[in-house]
């Protein structure tokens, strides 16, 4: 019986701000985490990701390359960020030229098990649990559904 190739990430080449909490196990590598952030267990944050100050990333979330998240955000449990839009009809298979960036501005809350495709989301947005964000969000408000649509403004 063959042995698999094993890769261990853990916490490698991460730039941490002040007063950051990481609950292990977590895979963080080549990313930047701002001041006063919280990273829950079973989170993966890949290289070149930037997390702004006072942002919370809850357990079982996946933040792939080419994602930036602003200040004072909440990423609830099980949120998935996607950087490969399958623009060629299938997976890019590591061809970074086919990947696209995701930009999350400040004060954005993303509900549990939401999926965020390569988009930009403006400040002061709430994304409902289980939502699938397929297009840029340019107006503050509450968004939910698949695909995510604006339900109402913020009060």
Residue ranges of predicted features:
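Flexible, glycine/small-residue-enriched loop-and-beta-strand segment within the central core
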Residues: 1-16, 22-121, 146-147, 151-155
């Amino acid at each position: 019986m063959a042995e698999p190739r094993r890769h261990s990430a853990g916490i490698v080449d991460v730039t941490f701000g002040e007063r950051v909490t990481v609950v292990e196990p977590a895979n963080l590598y080549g990313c930047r985490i701002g001041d006063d952030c919280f990273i829950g267990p079973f989170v993966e944050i890949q290289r070149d990701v930037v997390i702004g100050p006072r942002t919370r990333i809850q357990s079982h979330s996946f933040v792939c390359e080419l994602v930036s998240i602003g200040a004072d955000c909440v990423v609830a449990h099980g949120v998935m960020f996607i950087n490969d839009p399958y623009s060629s009809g299938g997976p890019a298979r590591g061809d970074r030229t086919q990947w696209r960036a995701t930009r999350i501005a400040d004060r954005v809350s993303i509900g549990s098990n939401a999926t965020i495709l390569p988009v930009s989301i403006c400040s002061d947005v709430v994304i409902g649990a289980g939502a699938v964000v397929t297009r840029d969000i340019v107006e503050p408000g509450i968004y939910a559904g698949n695909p995510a649509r604006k339900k109402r403004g913020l009060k």
